[in-house]
């Protein structure tokens, strides 16, 4: 089968698992709050349950070293995500949504970890390694699609139940279409089975930085719709910010995927992406539409592009260990994400808003960029010493 078909199917799988299964919670939060199912603090805890599940799923995916294990997690996670989204239509109240979001987090992590490694193998075997990065447009296209669906449903006066049902049916149709087209884990293609040796020293600062990114990006990514709804009460303009976030994120991934490769370019782009994202988080604090618009552009653009850059940087640092490193990086990212909604819940409880949490999120992104900049300089020095 054509590698292009495999990559497109993988992109749509991430559309389902991440864009629908994971991030559809964001446009639903204003509904859940307006319907009296939860308050802002409860919404933060529901999001935290989702990210705790993501952490559990990522850690579990580290154990999927055999093709049969990876196969079960990929397809089990994909179909579980569909079922969970449909089941959310009948859920009401805090605890049912906590349980479902936790399960959705586990399922989405399984799909992301396994499929990221498989897509990289497909692209490398086809002699077109840059193709693998395009699968990261899947989550952002899912965000765009669910955001537009949410806008249409809100204009029609529908609540959270109808939205969950539409998201679930969309995921079901796509999963039926792509199931036979997805790459299958195979014994000889499983990079995790090849001897990789110890991880290079440069990998660990990348892991720490990516964990900080999890803290930094997740608060605006989770609460953007709620922040817009709070500023534009009853206006349809509030529903435009989330699909716009998805569109900008898609453009960011395409820009990174199509950039001209060069020595050290991945590190430079990563530092720039993280610092732009920090500005975007701070911009969410500006009053009115201007602040949210800047937040959409500068948080959305680097949103998935930074994830792609981290994965590319990890492959550059440790090519043979890439499959195992994807799982560890995703676990670190998930741990950071878990801290984000908890910070948001504490911020809401003690200050009545998200301002303190957003300031801490921006600080985490600035620190992550600084760590990557320092690591780049150290790698340059080591390279000069080795040549000398």
List PLM regions with ranges.
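Helix-loop-helix hairpin linking two adjacent transmembrane segments in secondary transporters
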Residues: 94, 125-182
């Amino acid at each position: 089968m054509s590698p292009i078909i495999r990559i497109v199917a993988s992109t749509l799988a991430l559309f389902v698992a991440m864009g629908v299964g994971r991030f559809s919670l964001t446009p639903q939060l204003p509904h859940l709050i307006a319907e009296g199912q939860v308050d802002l603090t409860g919404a933060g805890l529901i999001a935290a349950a989702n990210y705790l599940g993501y952490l559990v799923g990522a850690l579990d995916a580290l154990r999927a070293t055999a093709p049969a294990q990876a196969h079960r997690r990929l397809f089990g996670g994909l179909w579980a995500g569909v079922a969970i989204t449909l089941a959310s239509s009948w859920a009401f109240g805090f605890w049912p949504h906590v349980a479902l979001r936790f399960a959705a987090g586990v399922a989405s992590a399984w799909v992301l970890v396994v499929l990221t490694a498989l897509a990289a193998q497909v692209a490398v075997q086809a002699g077109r390694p840059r193709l693998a990065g395009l699968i990261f447009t899947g989550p952002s296209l899912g965000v765009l699609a669910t955001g537009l669906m949410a806008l249409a449903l809100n204009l029609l006066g529908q609540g959270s139940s109808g939205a969950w049902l539409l998201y679930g049916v969309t995921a079901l149709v796509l999963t039926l279409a792509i199931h036979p087209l997805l790459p299958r884990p195979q014994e000889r293609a499983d990079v995790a089975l090849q001897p990789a040796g110890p991880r290079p020293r440069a990998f660990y600062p990348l892991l720490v930085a990516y964990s900080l990114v999890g803290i930094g990006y997740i608060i605006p990514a989770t609460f953007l719709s709620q922040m817009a709804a709070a500023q534009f009460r009853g206006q349809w303009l509030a529903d435009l910010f989330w699909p716009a976030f998805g569109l900008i994120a898609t453009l960011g991934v395409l820009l990174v995927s199509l950039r001209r490769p060069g020595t050290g370019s991945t590190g430079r782009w990563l530092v720039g992406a993280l610092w732009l994202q920090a500005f975007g988080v701070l911009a969410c604090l500006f009053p009115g539409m201007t602040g949210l618009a800047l937040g959409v552009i500068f948080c959305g653009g680097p949103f998935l592009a930074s994830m792609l850059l981290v994965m590319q940087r990890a492959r550059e640092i440790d090519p043979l260990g890439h499959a195992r490193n994807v799982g560890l990086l995703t676990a670190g990212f998930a741990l950071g994400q878990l801290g984000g909604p908890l910070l948001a819940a504490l911020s809401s409880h003690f200050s009545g808003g998200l301002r303190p949490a957003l300031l801490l999120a921006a600080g985490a992104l600035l620190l992550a960029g600084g760590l990557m900049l320092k690591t780049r300089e150290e790698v340059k020095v080591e390279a000069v010493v080795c040549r000398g």
